[in-house]
Regions:
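Periplasmic polypeptide-binding modules associated with outer-membrane biogenesis and secretion
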Residues: 1-296, 326
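Outer-membrane beta-barrel translocator domains and adjoining extracellular loop/strand segments
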Residues: 71, 333-339, 362-366
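Hydrophobic, lipid-facing positions within transmembrane beta-strands of outer-membrane proteins
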Residues: 274, 301-307, 344-350, 374
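Transmembrane beta-strand segments that form the barrel wall of outer-membrane beta-barrel proteins
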Residues: 286-296, 307, 318-337, 374-381
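Residue-level signature of outer-membrane beta-barrel architecture
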Residues: 311-313, 354, 380
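Short loop/turn motifs that connect adjacent beta-strands in outer-membrane beta-barrel proteins
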Residues: 314-320, 357-373
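C-terminal structural cap/anchor segments
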Residues: 323, 343, 348-350, 364-367
Length: 381
């Protein structure tokens, strides 16, 4: 594959070629594990050309083309894809059309400093999709529980003979279903956070441990990033098998939303309330494992065994205590100057791992943000 433009990297699109050449590794020898020869398929070649054209158009080369040259020698065929990207298109005028006034007052997308798409930038589908994701993430971290990037789309306008594209980003209003009327997007505040257990009536973890692992906060807006951090924090706890987080909208919690800055949000800025239910399933706190093994050192046979006790929730804070007893025996034969024919070894190792940074004078906020572990270990041989 090659390009007729020196500035274009044709190798970056090699993944779009549907039929790959047979590997030449061990080609001089008969290799039973090599792949079968690839039979040239004209349909696959034509589809490859279409995929390559579409990939270049997505990068802003709207008039791109592909040529396919084939040469045959006996039963072998060489196919060469030649890319003709042409002149790339750039973004011209960029406008943001936000139908929801509350969202416009929060994001201020009419101000250039709050826009990632700028006139003169190379047009690409990836850049447009990244802007959709960016805006969606900002809103989903600011209380918009039911928002997603599908509420955002682009319209484009081109002028014949010019290589710039006028873009308009449209952010539509909320529709609960296809037949439902359009409304402003609901904004949610978390009312209560409840901790539930599958295993018993209560969770065998201290409440402060649960609170430190929960990035979501009561009285704060719903946040998708805080939700993911909460999942990650619980996954770090050795005492926890799995976590499932569900949200329930509070009935009759629809209130008139205040239109204003999100930084100065008060109780009336949110027109919906959510209850967050965190379901925690814990592992068995204690386990015992036994591992035998055989040894062979320079022809001297022996045996070893280890017995390990593990407690994953020592102080009801997901602290992990591990104590390992190990013994080994080996019969020594034919070693000159060695009197004792038997070699024995005993060892004990203990570890205590805290799922937090253990140090004095740490604030609660720091403890909740950090993800470090602290480990104490002692051994005897």
């Amino acid at each position: 594959m090659e390009s007729d433009s020196d500035d274009y990297d044709a190798g970056a699109l090699k993944q779009y070629v549907r039929q790959k050449e047979k590997p030449k590794l061990f080609s001089l020898f008969k290799n039973p594990f090599s792949r079968k020869p690839v039979i040239y398929d004209t349909l696959q070649a034509r589809l490859t050309c279409q995929d390559l054209v579409k990939a270049m158009q997505n990068q802003g080369f709207m008039h791109a083309g592909v040529s396919l040259n084939t040469t045959t020698e006996g039963k072998k065929l060489d196919a060469k894809y030649i890319l003709h990207p042409g002149i790339p298109y750039v973004m011209g005028k960029v406008e943001y059309d936000v139908e929801d006034e509350n969202i416009q007052n929060i994001l201020h997308l009419d101000e250039p400093d709050n826009q990632n798409l700028k006139p003169g930038m190379r047009f690409s589908v990836e850049a447009l999709d990244n802007e959709r994701k960016r805006i969606a993430n900002l809103l989903m971290d600011d209380g918009y529980f039911r928002f997603n990037k599908d509420f955002i789309y682009f319209s484009a306008d081109t002028i014949a003979g010019q290589n710039d594209i006028a873009l308009t980003l449209h952010l539509t209003k909320y529709k609960a279903s296809s037949n439902a009327p359009e409304t402003d997007h609901p904004r949610y505040q978390i009312r209560n956070i409840n901790y539930l257990s599958n295993d018993s009536d209560r969770i065998h973890l201290r409440r402060q441990v649960l609170l430190n692992a929960t990035a979501l906060k009561e009285g704060r807006p719903y946040s998708a990033s805080a939700l993911q951090r909460t999942y990650n924090n619980f996954a770090r706890l050795q005492a926890v098998k799995y976590t499932n987080i569900r949200f329930a909208e509070v009935p009759d919690s629809n209130r008139i939303a205040y239109v204003g800055e999100s930084q100065n949000a008060g109780d009336d800025d949110f027109n919906r309330l959510l209850d967050c239910n965190i379901q925690v399933s814990t592992n068995k706190p204690s386990t015992i494992s036994f591992q035998p093994e055989g040894t062979n050192t320079a022809g001297d046979f022996g045996a070893a065994a280890s017995l390990t006790y593990t407690n994953r929730n020592l102080f009801r804070g997901s602290e992990q205590l591990s104590i390992e007893f190990r013994g080994a025996y080996e019969a020594i034969t034919g070693l000159e100057g060695y009197q004792d024919q038997n070699y024995t070894e005993y060892s004990v190792e203990g570890k205590l791992v805290f799922p937090r940074f253990v140090a004095p004078f740490l604030s609660k906020n720091f403890r909740r943000r950090q993800t470090a572990n602290s480990e104490l270990s002692v051994s005897w041989d």
